[in-house]
Amino acid sequence: MTQDEMKKAAGWAALQYVEENSIVGVGTGSTVNHFIDALATMKFDIEGAVSSSEASTEKMKALGIPVFDLNSVNELSVYVDGADEINSQMDMIKGGGAALTREKIVAAVADKFICIVDNTKQVDILGEFPLPIEVIPMARSYVARQIVKLGGDPVYREGCVTDNGNIIIDVYNMKIMKPKELEQQIDGIVGVVTNGLFAKRGADILLVGTPEGVKTVTF
């Protein structure tokens, strides 16, 4: 089974957690694109979706899935999204696709976070994948200096503008032993919109695409 086939298997497996007549929170990325394809098969059974990015919104609209503004929705039963890394505590690094802020907002609203990945995303310690931080453009140099003090190597992601009009700094060479603490520390830096650590609000259910099929992990 190829990596993309494992992503597809995980994406389709998430369909079992979608309730009829509900509004579904939908994330961003290659694995989520498979989930969106799956969700389209039951678009007449759900009310619609809330999207975490312009890219996912476009794909869902093209498939005929109604997309709602989060401000018009009081609750979401599930949020389905991928991860760049996830550990055994269900802490994640997300934001490789630069949609981390909106992803974090939608995840905060949802009752249940379903994380869908292929088995290459499971790690013991977070940090091999660079940690993305969304930053107000004028604060770029200041935030980078503060990240160096925390032990990271900040790199400006050239040519990347988020859906919110901000920039991304990717932090390399950090072994993240205490994800919740670091998430809070980075979010406390003036000029940071948010960072790609999802530890305060981690995943509730993990669906892992493997060569043997989809494995379900709960914490």
Curated annotation (Swiss-Prot):
Q: What class of enzyme is it?
A: isomerase
Q: Which UniProt keywords apply?
A: Isomerase
Q: In which pathway does it act?
A: Carbohydrate degradation; pentose phosphate pathway; D-ribose 5-phosphate from D-ribulose 5-phosphate (non-oxidative stage): step 1/1
Q: Which GO terms describe its molecular function?
A: ribose-5-phosphate isomerase activity
In terms of PANTHER family, this protein maps to:
RIBOSE-5-PHOSPHATE ISOMERASE (PTHR11934:SF0)
Q: What does this protein do?
A: Catalyzes the reversible conversion of ribose-5-phosphate to ribulose 5-phosphate.
Indicate what this protein is called per its UniProt record. Ribose-5-phosphate isomerase A
Lineage of origin: Bacteria, Pseudomonadati, Pseudomonadota, Gammaproteobacteria, Alteromonadales
